[in-house]
A protein has these predicted regions:
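Bacterial N-terminal signal peptides that target proteins for export
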Residues: 1-10
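Extracellular glycan-targeting catalytic surfaces
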Residues: 14
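C-terminal motif of bacterial Sec signal peptides marking the signal peptidase cleavage site
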Residues: 17-19
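Ser/Thr-rich, low-complexity intrinsically disordered terminal regions
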Residues: 21-161
Length: 161
């Protein structure tokens, strides 16, 4: 009977300590960013590649025949391209590792469908605006949509010229 009581006390103590931990609130991941550009595939493809180059995005793979461009991972301040959520009511600040994959496919002869997928996680973060940057734990982040919107606005402007 003594060992059951001890086990219960240990369990209650462990649950009590776990309840004191900070709650991590993850941002909801948005769906992939999709749009259509009113220009042919070749013109749009050239505009996408030129725009990514102008924005100095490191590229890992370009496959024109399949319409895929994959960026390499690069560092971005949290809350510019990546929303990394909150811990205990404090917004995460610091740096995030982000990467994007752009898919393009012809839509008839005068249009191109584009989809941008994103993948993001914290690299060095802190709770709130002060404190030491930490590398662990790593939190998954969601796109703010800013990179995608800026990219496609620049592509649309480029194909109009």
């Amino acid at each position: 009977m003594g060992s059951i009581t001890t086990s219960r006390l240990l369990l209650i103590g462990a649950l009590g300590l776990a309840a004191c931990g900070r709650v991590y609130i993850s941002p909801l991941s948005p769906p992939p960013f999709r749009t259509e550009v009113p220009a042919g595939y070749d013109v749009t493809w050239a505009a996408i590649v030129r725009t990514l180059g102008n924005q100095n995005v490191p590229l890992r793979a370009i496959a024109r025949d399949s319409g895929v461009i994959a960026s390499d991972e690069f560092v971005s301040p949290i809350n510019v391209y990546a929303d990394c959520g909150e811990v205990g009511g404090d917004q995460l600040e610091g740096e995030a590792i982000v990467s994007f994959t752009v898919f393009a496919e012809p839509e008839g002869t005068s249009g191109t469908r584009i989809q941008v997928n994103s993948k993001m996680r914290t690299q060095a973060h802190r709770r709130g605006k002060s404190g030491k940057l930490r590398t662990a734990p790593v939190y998954q982040c969601a796109s703010t949509g800013r990179f995608e919107a800026n990219l496609l606005d620049a592509v649309r402007d480029s194909v109009k010229r």
